[in-house]
């Protein structure tokens, strides 16, 4: 088994000639390699809808973790329920932070997402994912190279130094148009916020719509240097 500890620059290759540009082959390999020791960390963005559909074909009882920060859009929570109905055998876990919002405010002040967004992300996303990955050998992410400068070198199989794990990224070669084409073709549910200018959807407090021609990550932590929550830093 390929693990963080046994990592070597591997020569594992996947055909990119099918409709999924290698994604289905990558997922088939991942679930064969790690069996029940792999989890998909899903934010329920539009890429997530594609991956859930593909994962359901490969492993209908796969583990899926959603980092419930308690400050997501209501539309996101409603979408999760629709996904549960569409893929009832998937094991969707809504992972909560250890601190409630009130407890966080007492310790760090009100609106931590404004005063110290990095700390807020650490408490409500990074630490919960660390806990979720503690007993796993690998995790799946919906990163695409096209999304941003920080993601353009992502590979199918990555040694993830942040979480000391193997990170599997099946959609690296997909474009934004290809993601939507797949969603429409398979009549997949998706967050209606995408239809009103939100290409990337995170917490309600830190996500704004993006103007025409803007980068897909422009609406995240708008007005701040921050462009990533920290889950994908190496």
Swiss-Prot record:
Sequence positions that bind [4Fe-4S] cluster: 120-121, 203, 206
Positions of the catalytic residues: 229
Keywords carried by this UniProt record: Cytoplasm, Iron, Iron-sulfur, Metal-binding, Oxidoreductase
Enzyme class: oxidoreductase
Catalytic activity: [thioredoxin]-disulfide + sulfite + AMP + 2 H(+) = adenosine 5'-phosphosulfate + [thioredoxin]-dithiol
EC number(s) on file: 1.8.4.10
Alphabetized GO MF terms: 4 iron, 4 sulfur cluster binding; adenylyl-sulfate reductase (thioredoxin) activity; metal ion binding; phosphoadenylyl-sulfate reductase (thioredoxin) activity
Swiss-Prot/TrEMBL cofactor(s): [4Fe-4S] cluster
Domain of life: Bacteria
InterPro entries linked: APS_reductase, PAPS/APS_Rdtase, PAPS_reduct_dom, Rossmann-like_a/b/a_fold
Cited Pfam families: PAPS_reduct
Listed GO CC annotations: cytoplasm
UniProt entry tagged with the keyword Electron transport: no
Cofactor binding note: Binds 1 [4Fe-4S] cluster per subunit.
Keyword DNA-binding: no
Subcellular location: Cytoplasm
Main location: cytoplasm
Pathway: Sulfur metabolism; hydrogen sulfide biosynthesis; sulfite from sulfate
Primary role: Catalyzes the formation of sulfite from adenosine 5'-phosphosulfate (APS) using thioredoxin as an electron donor.
Family: Belongs to the PAPS reductase family. CysH subfamily.
UniProt xrefs under HAMAP family: CysH
Protein name: Adenosine 5'-phosphosulfate reductase
UniProt source species: Bacillus thuringiensis subsp. konkukian (strain 97-27)
């Amino acid at each position: 088994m390929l693990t963080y500890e046994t990592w070597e620059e591997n020569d594992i290759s996947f055909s990119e000639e099918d409709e999924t540009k290698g994604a289905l082959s990558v997922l088939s390999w991942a679930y064969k390699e790690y069996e029940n020791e792999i989890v998909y960390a899903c934010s329920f963005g539009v890429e997530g809808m594609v991956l859930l559909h593909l994962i359901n074909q490969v492993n209908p009882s796969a583990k899926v973790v959603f980092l419930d920060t308690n400050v997501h859009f209501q539309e996101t929570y409603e979408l999760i329920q629709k996904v549960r109905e569409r893929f009832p055998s998937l094991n969707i876990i809504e992972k909560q932070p250890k601190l409630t919002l009130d407890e966080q405010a007492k310790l760090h002040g009100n609106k931590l997402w404004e005063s110290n967004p990095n700390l807020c992300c650490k408490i409500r996303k990074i630490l919960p994912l660390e806990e979720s990955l503690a007993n796993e050998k690998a995790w799946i992410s919906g990163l695409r190279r096209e999304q941003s400068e920080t993601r353009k070198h992502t590979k199918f199989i990555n040694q993830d130094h942040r979480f000391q794990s193997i990170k599997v990224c099946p959609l690296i070669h997909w474009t934004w148009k290809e993601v939507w084409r797949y969603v429409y073709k398979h009549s997949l549910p998706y967050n209606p916020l995408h239809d009103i200018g939100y290409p990337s959807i995170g917490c309600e407090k830190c996500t704004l719509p993006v103007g025409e021609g803007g980068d897909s990550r422009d609406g995240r932590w708008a007005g701040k240097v921050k462009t990533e929550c920290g889950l994908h830093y190496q």
